[in-house]
A protein has these predicted regions:
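Sec-dependent N-terminal signal peptides
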Residues: 4-13
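N-terminal beta-rich core of secreted/periplasmic extracellular enzymes
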Residues: 20-187
Length: 187
């Protein structure tokens, strides 16, 4: 009887060990990682760390430690190997803080022309070059997500964010937006 018990333990031990292993991002298929996420984790991944809850107040303050001045981070899920991703604002170039507490150097980003001015050139090659330069800065400063370009059209001249949009013409907006995204994604 003892032999059968020992044999059973050794046969099923690997299954017990592997049953507790969680899929890790980058090592397991993405579908498995998503299946292992709780509904709360999925919601937090989509909403980021701007939400106020007791257990994530620490994560909200981490953005400035990663990239000072960045717009925010996504909620990290360490048990599945999902890191916090840094989001940076940038319809006219990457916007982050120029100063770091830990470094005496100043970190300037390029201030590119606003979207309406870029679109007025009708030059998709130029816009793609601007996008590539933005993408380079995003990469160099350690940001993961650029919250740009803004893909909207000018519907009302009183809209306070029209400077972020390319044009009132949907055709021009589409052509320029494609060029910008291609440029950013070259990195």
């Amino acid at each position: 009887m003892i032999k059968y018990c020992i044999f059973s333990i050794f046969c099923f031990l690997p299954f017990l060990i592997w049953a507790d292993e969680l899929p890790q991002l980058g090592k397991a298929p993405l579908e498995k990682v998503i299946q292992a996420m709780t509904v709360d984790e999925k919601i937090r991944l989509l909403t980021g760390t701007g939400e106020v809850a007791e257990d994530i107040l620490v994560a909200v303050g981490e953005t400035d430690k990663i990239v000072p001045g960045a717009a925010g981070t996504t909620y990290p899920i360490p048990r599945l190997g999902i890191p916090a991703m840094v989001m940076a604002d940038g319809p006219a170039g990457l916007r982050i803080s120029a100063r770091r507490d830990s470094c005496p150097r100043t970190f300037y980003c390029t201030a590119f022309p606003v979207a309406t001015l870029l679109a007025s050139t009708w030059n998709t090659d130029l816009v793609q070059q601007v996008g590539q330069a933005m993408g380079n800065e995003v990469l160099e400063y350690g940001c993961d997500i650029l919250l740009a370009p803004a893909l909207n059209i000018h519907r009302n001249p009183l809209c306070g964010r029209n400077f972020e949009y390319y044009s009132e013409d949907p055709f021009l907006t589409g052509k320029i937006a494609v060029a910008m995204v291609k440029g950013i994604q070259q990195n």
